[in-house]
């Protein structure tokens, strides 16, 4: 296993152009992301701490490496998304905390899928160019053909390596993206298969599928979310989740964490004191042996000593979380940067450790950074004026490229010989005004209704509004019978057309209803007149000849109708029915007549010709026609 490191023989001071480029590459003022500092704790000059911090860069790097190397599955990378709060009113933001890249086991999978060889070569040149410029930006060596930088980045950059690099530029609001959803729901998210990744609503999952990944896992922990990715199909494993919960409990001493290549790992727990009482430490060595995947870590505590006018020794320990935005597009470089003697590679190899974080105006051989910036108090008697220190170490033997978002581990300026083989320590103190947290004004107004939760901020309110709007669209789509397209505009257009169609049907039904009422009134008048005339013209005995007990039942199905008439057999009711059907322009498909004693039952199946009758209309028309024939 090879560490992702930058070797340097001389200390290099960047010029103004490098400083401007660095400010554009990294966030220049992360102080707004830091939480309030903890109280000072004075330390003796020659004292040495006994324990490591429960959450620092070395510990986090070891945990990620132990998680991958000790797993039975073949994971390509591991990323720890660190949770932080931008301000007092916003939600939690997940940003890059640290990452460990191992690579694929199968070397045949390293080559990304490209449409043509020319596109593949152009893509590789672009990736190598970005890595060379990133290397020259950090090391102070301008990328050119004469300094050996091109030879240093000669191996192809795989898709998984590139996906791992661009992940440093991403951040997730609580509830958005796979890491944000895992943090919001406090439950792991396991996506396996290219189809599920491509169909996911998360842009990061679709991007991972495009870069050849087949499995992505996001497991929440106390301080953030652990993400693992693989180019193989790996199904859900409770053993992995238990390891994450155990390894990323930051009260565990990582000096006793060991992992084996066979997939078994064991961790020993040592009690740690209160984090507020821990000293700032400077881990001096971290050796990783790839043969048995054993992780050994040793650290020595270096205390910060600052002299003021009263010769008082003070130390400030605080932790903060902040996010970085890295831009991997092309950068322009001029010849103002100091050059190193050798070309340095910034490309992560297989099973490499890659860290990105804050940097200062000056760079020595090795920048030792931990998980957050350290703030030092200058004097207790000076109205709480504070100083910020960024410690950097120079080592002639090795330099480690470290971009870490987290607490900076500052080093002291205690006396050491310039000819010593160990790195010299420098401490720069910058005065900084105290930023008092603004008191959030209390909201005035009515309380929300019972059972309705008040949104935390405008982002949550907008999210709830969009969810409610989407639910209404789903309900509308369910009631509209014919939907041309699935977009919202087409759905609204189809709904409007359907509503207009229903309105026209209602209007036609009202017109038919009025027409039927008028016909019924006319029939009543005619029947009344005929009844009175027949009563006066014929004797009472002939009144019994009329079809008084005639029962007509009509059922209409489309253009077909079924007619059933039950009446007396006197005065030829079958002939009167056929005459009525002829007058109404109804074609007879089937007809039957049966007689039981004095009762005649007629059944007929007809088809409407020129006019479509409703059920009640046809019954009234048949009644009137048979009565007229009578």
UniProtKB/Swiss-Prot annotation:
Please give the tissue specificity annotation from the record for this chain: Highly expressed in trichomes and at lower levels in leaves and flowers. Expressed at low levels in roots, stems, leaves, flowers and fruits.
Q: What is this protein called?
A: Transcription factor MYC1
Sorted alphabetically, the Gene Ontology cellular component annotations on this record are: nucleus
What's the gene?
MYC1
What domain of life is recorded for the organism? Eukaryota
PANTHER family documented for this protein: MYC (PTHR11514), TRANSCRIPTION FACTOR MYC1 (PTHR11514:SF138)
> Where along the chain is composition biased (Basic residues)?
440-449
Species this protein is from: Solanum lycopersicum (Tomato)
Q: Does the keyword Kinase apply?
A: no
Q: What is the effect of changing residue 161 to K?
A: Enhanced transcriptional activity
**Which keywords fit this entry according to its UniProt record?**
Activator, Developmental protein, DNA-binding, Nucleus, Stress response, Transcription, Transcription regulation
Q: Where is this region: Helix-loop-helix motif?
A: 467-502
Q: What is its main location?
A: nucleus
